[in-house]
């Protein structure tokens, strides 16, 4: 969920797990995935941070445990070393990334709220991973513009994960396409946006879901016709679209 988004209003949850964001129609099936595949193999540091984040009032902003596992595996498969994350919150996905990178791997992490990042920082430090993270507080676009202006940064990132303000996803993509290497990946989170991407125009949606829905739809349409990337939209968490740069 976006770093700038409102906290969700209290209502009966479809799943009991914090940050579930699952689009599966069966609670039992999602619980089966968590208990069979995710929780038994979840690193102790990720479990600790997940439980700490569960106590935060905006805990639905966190990356779900199954998506964290997916990202960790993906980064290992592509042998990622130099990465970027836009939208950090308490750092659950950041920790999943740091665990997957080699000891000299790097993550340029950006978020408008350092206070949230510092909730998870002690866990990251205890895991011996803080040296991999370069955290920058503030809006991402000005920093991205600085990076793009220097051509030595072009094509240097193996993986970039975006889980921030949906109304800027298109603006991020315009810049990130130059920074990710050919063959590298950009992952855009929440691209199914609570399932609202297929909801009727008059559907009763929460205010923040309705507000960001059009921006998510705009991104999805743009990625579908962008010849510079190959894409794969996956129903993991709240939907993640992987873009592999080909030119």
Swiss-Prot record:
Binding site for substrate: 21, 163, 194
Catalysed reactions listed for this entry: (E)-caffeoyl-CoA + S-adenosyl-L-methionine = (E)-feruloyl-CoA + S-adenosyl-L-homocysteine + H(+)
Record-listed a divalent metal cation binding positions: 163, 189-190
GO biological process, one term: methylation
Amino acids binding S-adenosyl-L-methionine: 63, 85, 87-88, 93, 111, 140, 165
InterPro entries for the chain: Cation-dep_OMT (IPR050362), SAM-dependent_MTases_sf (IPR029063), SAM_O-MeTrfase (IPR002935)
Keyword Transferase: yes
Cofactor binding note: Binds 1 divalent metal cation per subunit.
Organism domain of life: Eukaryota
GO MF assignments: caffeoyl-CoA O-methyltransferase activity; metal ion binding
Enzyme class: transferase
Entry keyword set: Lignin biosynthesis, Metal-binding, Methyltransferase, S-adenosyl-L-methionine, Transferase
Co-factor requirement: a divalent metal cation
Pathway entry: Aromatic compound metabolism; phenylpropanoid biosynthesis
Gene3D superfamilies reported for this sequence: Vaccinia Virus protein VP39
EC numbers for this chain: 2.1.1.104
Family named by the database record: Belongs to the class I-like SAM-binding methyltransferase superfamily. Cation-dependent O-methyltransferase family. CCoAMT subfamily.
Function, in words: Methylates caffeoyl-CoA to feruloyl-CoA and 5-hydroxyferuloyl-CoA to sinapoyl-CoA. Plays a role in the synthesis of feruloylated polysaccharides. Involved in the reinforcement of the plant cell wall. Also involved in the responding to wounding or pathogen challenge by the increased formation of cell wall-bound ferulic acid polymers.
Name recorded for this polypeptide: Caffeoyl-CoA O-methyltransferase 2
Species of origin: Eucalyptus globulus (Tasmanian blue gum)
């Amino acid at each position: 969920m976006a770093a700038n988004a409102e906290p969700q209003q209290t209502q009966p949850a479809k799943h009991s797990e914090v940050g579930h964001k699952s689009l599966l129609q069966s609670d039992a099936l999602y619980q089966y995935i968590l208990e069979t595949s995710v929780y038994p193999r979840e690193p102790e540091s990720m479990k600790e941070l997940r439980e700490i984040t569960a106590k935060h009032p905006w805990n639905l902003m966190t990356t779900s445990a199954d998506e964290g596992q997916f990202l960790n595996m993906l980064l290992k498969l592509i042998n990622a070393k130099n990465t970027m994350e836009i939208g950090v919150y308490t750092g659950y996905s950041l920790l999943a990334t740091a665990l997957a990178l080699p000891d000299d791997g790097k993550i340029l992490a950006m978020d408008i709220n350092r206070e949230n990042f510092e909730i998870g920082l002690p866990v990251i430090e205890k895991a011996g991973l803080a040296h991999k993270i370069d955290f920058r507080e503030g809006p991402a676009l000005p920093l991205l513009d600085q990076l793009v202006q220097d051509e030595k940064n072009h094509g240097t990132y193996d993986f970039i994960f975006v889980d921030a303000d949906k109304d800027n996803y298109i603006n991020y993509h315009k810049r990130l396409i130059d920074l990710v290497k050919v063959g590298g990946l950009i992952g855009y989170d929440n691209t199914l946006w609570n399932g609202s991407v297929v909801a009727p125009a008059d559907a009763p949606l929460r205010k923040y879901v309705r507000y960001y829905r059009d921006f998510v739809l705009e991104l999805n349409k743009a990625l579908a016709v962008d010849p510079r990337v190959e894409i794969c939209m996956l129903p993991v968490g709240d939907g993640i679209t992987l873009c592999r740069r080909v030119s």
